[in-house]
Amino acid sequence: MSSEPPPPPQPPTHQASVGLLDTPRSRERSPSPLRGNVVPSPLPTRRTRTFSATVRASQGPVYKGVCKCFCRSKGHGFITPADGGPDIFLHISDVEGEYVPVEGDEVTYKMCSIPPKNEKLQAVEVVITHLAPGTKHETWSGHVISS
């Protein structure tokens, strides 16, 4: 019996030895209304926003817009500003009130810059002011109503 420890395991030196061959892989994707818009990464949320950014946003003006799309399972969507301009990113943590936004809902919101470059904006303190007519709305607790 030898008192020397066994040599440490060596990592594989060739891709084929670990099953990573250069083969084209395609992934089926479901159509998404959010595909044309770029989602910030990492997603800025109410929890991760700094106190100073929250204060600046709260003191800012209130804007009006329409919900372009919102995916509850993904936790984000976009608002089309009433005065034109590029769509504004919306995170689930910034939606106030009892209803999940749907396409066509009229909303009011304030804006906050998205770090680290602060070049883009996101909607915060989002409030649904008018539910889109003829659509079903869900509450955060799961109840469905027709508007």
From Swiss-Prot:
Effect of residue 76 to Q: Reduced affinity for single-stranded DNA
Domain CSD residue range list: 62-129
Modified sites of kind N-acetylserine: 2
Source superkingdom: Eukaryota
Modification after translation, per record: Dephosphorylated by calcineurin in a Ca(2+) dependent manner. Can be phosphorylated by DYRK2 (in vitro).
Pro residues composition-biased segments: 1-12
GO CC annotation, single: P-body
GO molecular function: mRNA 3'-UTR binding; phosphatase binding
Residues bearing PTM Phosphoserine: 30, 32, 41, 52, 58, 146-147
Protein localization: Cytoplasm; Cytoplasm, P-body; Cytoplasmic granule
Keywords in alphabetical order: Acetylation, Cytoplasm, Phosphoprotein, RNA-binding
InterPro entries hit by this protein: Ca-reg_mRNA-binding_domain, CSD, CSD_CS, CSP_DNA-bd, NA-bd_OB-fold
Keyword DNA-binding: no
Stretch list, region Disordered: 1-52
Modified residues annotated as Phosphothreonine in this record: 45
GO biological process, one term: intracellular signal transduction
Tagged with keyword Membrane: no
Subunit organization: Homodimer. Interacts with STYX.
Function in brief: Binds mRNA and regulates the stability of target mRNA. Binds single-stranded DNA (in vitro).
Protein's name according to its UniProt entry: Calcium-regulated heat-stable protein 1
Species classification: Eukaryota, Metazoa, Chordata, Craniata, Vertebrata
